[in-house]
Amino acid sequence: MHAYVYKSQRKQDTFVYLATRDDFSGLPAEVQAQLAPFSFVLEVALTPERRLAQADVATVREALGKHGFYLQLPKTRVLAGECDYD
């Protein structure tokens, strides 16, 4: 399985993986409105052995098969003093 990865031009560190190159038709309108425009980054073969920096390959493959896209959001950063510890 191949994925086509696009970077949001509006939201830093936000990427969309598509099952078909340039086919944003399966991406919800709300998501497109918040993240578009997109720029193509790369094509990647999603083999079980493949490692991705911030996503699990099996999860990405499942989402592409079901929905035609996978949305990778930036990791949440927690700064010291922002968490309550019991």
From Swiss-Prot:
Organism: Xanthomonas oryzae pv. oryzae (strain KACC10331 / KXO85)
PROSITE patterns: YCGL
Cysteines engaged in disulfide bonds, as pairs: none
Family annotation (SUPFAM superfamilies): YcgL-like (SSF160191)
Domain YcgL: 1-83
Pfam family, one: YcgL
Name of this protein: YcgL domain-containing protein XOO0464
HAMAP family the record matches: UPF0745
